[in-house]
Amino acid sequence: MRNVTLVLSDGTKFHGKSFGYDAPVAGEVVFNTAMMGYPESLTDPSDAGQLLTMTFPLVGNYGVPPFTIEESGIPTFMESDKIYVSALIVSDYTEEHSHWNAVESLADWLKREHVPGITGIDTRELTKVLREHGVMMGKILFDDEPNNIPEADYEGVNFVDRVSTKEIIHYNEGAGKKVVLVDCGVKANIIRSLITRGVEVIRVPWNYDYTGMDYDGLFLGNGPGDPDMCNDAVEVIRKQMSMSKKPICGICMGNQLLSKAAGAKIYKLKYGHRGHNQPVRMVGTDKCYITSQNHGYAVDASTLDKDWQELFVNMNDGSNEGIRHKENPWFTSQFHPEACSGPVDTYFMFDKFVETLK
């Protein structure tokens, strides 16, 4: 393993060893508190452009499952068809993996997909730095090479445009109700969660004008980066809401886009919510759910139009976790009810949406 250094934009340095693809890289340094699920996290398009730090110390111990495609056309064990993170940062990479479904090691997978990995980092200290000072840009540099990699511009890039489908894709054709899925970087398990409930899914590009299509409901998927880069999608959502009261549901980026269409403002969280243990409360009830989350931006609920209200609130920091319209069947969650990986406490969100289609 070659010696590498993680250099944060404030000058803080962490020294470690390379266990992935040997190449320098720059991106936004973030942390994820999940104890498992690295195959899903690495292939989640929402992590595009990020240097992902896993706070759980042992990573790689169960290897990597095979990349297979289900009959429905979506990956079986991954959330997309490739790794989207720019690099993986861990405390202790486990070289000898063991799992009945593993076909290769995490290191071999990273190398095959040309994704750098760094181990031996004090991820506890790194997380404390990010928690105190906020997420920041960083570089992974090789100690025996000159620093000739440019700074990354995370907030100035439309990552949604990079990861979204470029063509219309149909799933479960011929099923009962039709749902248009706006792909901002949608995870495979969101598609799976819809088609297993007996609907046809029509996956469209993030900025596609679907208002003239024949469908029964609209679903706004997750995605990476700054939602303010996606105003084209917001305008189409507004157009749809002005034309009909067809059901609308959104997840993660979908929550932010629908909120923008409802007049709300978006702001960047200090260090985001990334992990499997985020508690949220359903507004107006005493019900609290443990959720899987992966976002760095949040909705300023105080700026919502008067016809809208909060649906969920984060119990840790009070930030918005979902909205709903007071009359029409339009609602969202900032968290991921489909999990994969993580808790499935809020899987009922898909049931609620499909029920509104009938």
Regions found by a protein language model. Give the residues of each.
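Proline-centered loop/turn at the N-terminus of a beta-strand
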Residues: 116, 178, 247-249, 265, ...
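Active-site-proximal beta-strand elements of phosphoester/diester hydrolases
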Residues: 178-183, 291-292, 331-335
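Short amphipathic alpha-helix with an adjacent loop that forms part of the alpha/beta core around
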Residues: 208-214
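Catalytic beta-strand/loop cores that center a nucleophilic Ser/Cys/Thr
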Residues: 287-327
